[in-house]
Amino acid sequence: LQQSSAASDVYKRQKINISEKDRIAAYTPNQIETVECFLGASAIGSIWSSCSPDFGVPGVIERFSQIKPKLLVITDKYYYNGKEINIIERLPAILKKIKKIKSVLILNYPGKKLRKLNKIKNIKIYYYSEIGKLEISRNKLKKFDFDHELAILYSSGTTGKPKCICHRSGGVLLQHLKEHQLHCNIKPNDNVFYFTT
């Protein structure tokens, strides 16, 4: 929770200039830092969108170019079947096609050495590993409407260009309540493995 607060604080105050209704695109694997960034985004009312790192550059551009994000959250690498996959080398191609991105927040893959990035013209680069060193403001969380946009996800793109699907705060909460409590009967201290593509 503290890191989520730090993330939302960084979005607002630390020159990234992200505010309510702004879009944040994430090109990251499922790691705790991704969740912290998502919670930080939702705390200030910005709209989260994400693509799996196994998407190639064209798949990412097809999706994120539709939403015009101000900030791209990206991990430096991920691992598949024991092999290291470098994602950060894809960044220049993404930035070349999505001109609205003004800032990049780089997450380090847990337990691995961070790949630092060379400066990119007209793009501000931030490192998530430095967020914890910032002094965090203790503002009260703002309440948003049931209908407030929370996240934009995408159709598969099998029948043409992927289509944006906007998920609203209230609907996401109701869906999780329904799935977790009614469908799956999840109780405190239960372990859950939820596999999806």
Language model segments and positions:
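Alpha-helix termination/capping residues and helix-transition junctions
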Residues: S4, K15-I18, Q66, K97-I98, ...
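Conserved AMP-binding/adenylate-forming
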Residues: K12-I61, N191-T197
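Conserved acidic residues
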Residues: D22, K70, K102, D147, ...
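Conserved pre-ATP/AMP-binding loop-to-beta segment of ANL
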Residues: L105-I106, N118-Y154, K161, G171-H176, ...
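Single conserved hydrophobic/aromatic residue that forms the stacking wall/gate
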Residues: L1-A7, Y11
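Short internal alpha-helix immediately C-terminal to a glycine-rich phosphate-binding loop
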Residues: D9-N17, K178-N185
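Structural core segment of the AMP-binding/adenylate-forming
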Residues: K15-I16, A43-S129
